[in-house]
Amino acid sequence: MADDSIFLIDIDKILKTKAGKKSKYIPRFVTSYLKRIVHQDELNVFLHDSKDKVGVEFLEACMEFLDAKVEIKGLENLPKEGKCTFVSNHPLGGQDGVALGYILGKHYGGNVRYLVNDLLMNLHGLAPLCIPINKTGSQSRDFPKMVEAGFSSDNHIIMFPAGLCSRRQNGVIRDLEWKKTFVTKSVETQRDVVPLHFEGRNSDFFYNLANLCKFVGIKFNICLLYTSDAA
């Protein structure tokens, strides 16, 4: 493939896209810090090395890259027939998304799809398993159609109804309120809802930062930047 850059993370380009002309006022030390905390160089080496892997094979490569060790209980209880909506708590962020996609994708021969933020469609290896959704921006008008198309397909659906990974609330680590979309759409499309539970937690720094952002009213999900080091 001629242009490997389409697979790579480019913080400078992202800032220019999101901030426009204002991006030139962002101090260089800030962009350097962002590149470091998201592990841009390490991730780009991985993305380059795995550029020919797609779907479940790409998720398997992700598991190996993350050196993820997962203990699975109850695999024999997964439905053998029918279309399912698999819903799970979201304790870690990207890591549990990768793990569940790999486990279910391998079990069902790749016949699974995530409902995900459209930004993840930029990951070439993940894109075949994704149904892109975006409630904001130019794509917002198509959001209902995309959800409908996903649930009407023959693929199993993987969802994290909380939307964001778990937070510490009143000393207890738990999901935010689950959105009911998965229930209403599963009923409409005659899907079985299969609840899954993923055990894990992020660092105290992550939870403290999340609560601080909430306290001061920062709406941007800054904590997302730290999930790679928080688990």
Residue ranges of predicted features:
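Conserved small/polar residues in nucleotide/adenosyl-binding loops
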Residues: 226-231
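Membrane-anchoring hydrophobic helices of lipid-metabolizing enzymes
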Residues: 1-84, 97-99, 109, 127
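Conserved Motif II region of HX4D acyltransferases
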Residues: 82-90, 147-200
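A conditional alpha-helix N-cap/helix-loop micro-motif detector
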Residues: 52, 68, 137-141, 175-176
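Short, electropositive alpha-helical surface patch
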Residues: 207-225
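A short secondary-structure junction signal
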Residues: 97-99, 125-128, 142-143, 162, ...
